[in-house]
Amino acid sequence: MKALEKSKPEEGLWMVQAPVPEIGPDDVLIKIKKTGICGTDIHIWNWDEWAAHTVPVPMITGHEFAGEIVELGRDVTGLSIGQRVSGEGHLIGTESRQSRAGKFHLDPGTRGIGVNVQGAFAQYLRLPAFNVVPLPEDIPDEIGAILDPLGNAVHTALSFDLLGEDVLITGAGPIGIMAAAVAKHAGARHVVITDINADRLKLAQHVVPRARTVDVTREDLGDVVHELGLKQGFDVGLEMSGSQAALDQMVEALVMGGKIALLGIPPGKSPVDWSRIVFKAITIKGVYGREMFETWYKMIAMLQNGLDVSRVITHRFGVDEFREGFAAMKSGLSGKVVLDWT
């Protein structure tokens, strides 16, 4: 089968011929139709410090996918050959306290497909049946291929009650933009999304017309608070950028007793003004992955009830054009990039 592989410990990925995975009794074999390129895949392509310390070589990469079941393990029930599916890319154990309590996404032994084990940038993927998520007929494959990052957005946005609340989102990457769409869909009053990249903000306005976009290099966030008639500030903050400056700005823009969900990852240690957070009585929640499988149920239900994130997909390439796809993603000018394996 064709597969995109990190074959050497250096920049790039390589198209190779790899054996079709053999499945175990509790696995399924999925024929891949569409895959999304993720920021994690860019780290692996660039072979930065994180990738060099995390990813064994060789490794078939990729973890955002949609496809069709073509083989079932002998003990698999509830799934069928020909069924359209996506799936959770975090593979968990069953022995930790978190897993035994049903908090699967917090299992400390979690491994990721395309990072720790062979991934989805291939014509076929082996996946535990436990991780498989069937796709309803009204959700197309290319949306199925971005459910993983949409799940990050949903998990982050729904960390706190948003109904009637004013929400600040820092970072207008694809996940931040989808979080803005989720927040409006969930009943937030005002949703403001900030960035320093004008192209990303233009895309955010295109995907979520009812959100207010702010280029913080050109516009003062305090003026926006006044413009919207917020007496104290925002009720909820969703930090998606990993920027310390953005987090500092968010803390200042929140009401007393405000809440922050953190998904963005800083490039290193950051000097946090904890006294300001304490004296404003701010609640902070770190967000990792997707709740298994509550996040999946919620995002599929929202997609079937009017949530539209299709415009966040800006580039589509055949898999043989993967270099162009990665170049688009690395440019900082794209939304989601989808590769077609059919």
From Swiss-Prot:
Tell me the GO BP annotations in alphabetical order.
L-threonine catabolic process to glycine
The highest taxon in the source lineage is Bacteria
Keywords, comma-separated and alphabetical: Cytoplasm, Metal-binding, NAD, Oxidoreductase, Zinc
Which residues are NAD(+)-binding? I175, D195, R200, L263, G264, I265, V287, Y288
Binding of Zn(2+) occurs at C38, H63, E64
| Cofactor binding, note field | Binds 1 Zn(2+) ion per subunit.
Give the species this sequence originates from.
Ruegeria pomeroyi (strain ATCC 700808 / DSM 15171 / DSS-3)
The record's listing under InterPro entries reads: ADH-like_C, ADH-like_N, ADH_Zn_CS, GroES-like_sf, NAD(P)-bd_dom_sf, PKS_ER, Zn_alcohol_dh
Report what the protein is called.
Answer: L-threonine 3-dehydrogenase
Q: Which family does it belong to?
A: Belongs to the zinc-containing alcohol dehydrogenase family.
Active site residues according to the UniProt entry = T40, H43
